[in-house]
């Protein structure tokens, strides 16, 4: 049975950036990694309603900078910046003896962001909306926003069925084997009365690097 690897895996360093931008020696690496995990979990849990797509963590000597990509920046910043100050104070308890800087980045097209689409489908499933309807609506919104292709998958006891299964819906193209293809991937879980339902979303936004054919054509034209 063919298994799918994480679409970001082979693309990091080619067309995708790292979510953690720091270097540590063997002695401190594990501590930093655990700290990163705690920070991500806390921010995600604390600001779930704001639609947090991803969190970049940059480290210097005694400084940690968080770039939080969100669909609703106002919900995190709060009135007069109170929300962001509150978040910073709470994070300071997790990260001791380090100065925290928080930078909020707005996600311009949340309907084309794989993580936010997955979370939206999961929220609808928790509200007892039919999974097919939730998936198809998300696909339609994404295609209208101008993406080249989208694929969704829901796994679990769909519709309260006795036997768990996986259902896929897709539209457009999803070239998973093409490393220059900008494929965004998101995963979320819905806690329903029948158990957890996993939601996976792949979004193809177009090629990042120019195709070999185009380069050859330019070289011939210049010759």
Curated annotation (Swiss-Prot):
Ranges where the KH type-2 domain occurs: 39-108
InterPro entries, sorted: KH_dom, KH_dom-like_a/b, KH_dom_type_2, KH_sf_prok-type, Ribosomal_S3_C_sf, Ribosomal_uS3_bac-typ, Ribosomal_uS3_C, Ribosomal_uS3_CS
Residue ranges the record marks as coiled coil: none
The keyword RNA-binding appears for this protein: yes
GO-annotated biological processes: translation
GO molecular function: mRNA binding; rRNA binding; structural constituent of ribosome
GO cellular component: cytosolic small ribosomal subunit
Keyword Transcription belongs to the record: no
Record text on subunit structure and interactions: Part of the 30S ribosomal subunit. Forms a tight complex with proteins S10 and S14.
PANTHER family found in the cross-reference section: 30S/40S RIBOSOMAL PROTEIN S3, SMALL RIBOSOMAL SUBUNIT PROTEIN US3C
Protein family (similarity comment): Belongs to the universal ribosomal protein uS3 family.
Protein name: Small ribosomal subunit protein uS3
